[in-house]
Amino acid sequence: MARLKVTQINSGIGRKQNQRETLRSLGLHKIGQSVVKDDKPEFRGMVNTVSHLVTVEEVD
C-alpha cells in the first residue's frame, strides 16, 4: 500500500473549526510538521478538506 507524507505549510488560525480539527486528527500541530500515513480513502478525504494548508508527497 502506498504511503503519503503530509506537511503542514499554513496555520489553522482563523480557519473554520472543521479545518482546525482535521489538522489535529491528521496529527499536525505546527507549521513544517510532517506525518506519514497509509493512502486510504478516509485519509484522502481529510487531506482534501485542508488541501490549502498542507502539501502531499508519495513516499516509497
Curated annotation (Swiss-Prot):
The lineage of its organism: Bacteria, Bacillati, Actinomycetota, Actinomycetes, Kineosporiales. GO terms for molecular function: structural constituent of ribosome. GO terms for cellular component: cytosolic large ribosomal subunit. It comes from Kineococcus radiotolerans (strain ATCC BAA-149 / DSM 14245 / SRS30216). NCBIfam families: rpmD_bact (TIGR01308). The keyword Ribosomal protein applies. This is Large ribosomal subunit protein uL30. It holds the Pfam family Ribosomal_L30. Belongs to the universal ribosomal protein uL30 family. Part of the 50S ribosomal subunit.
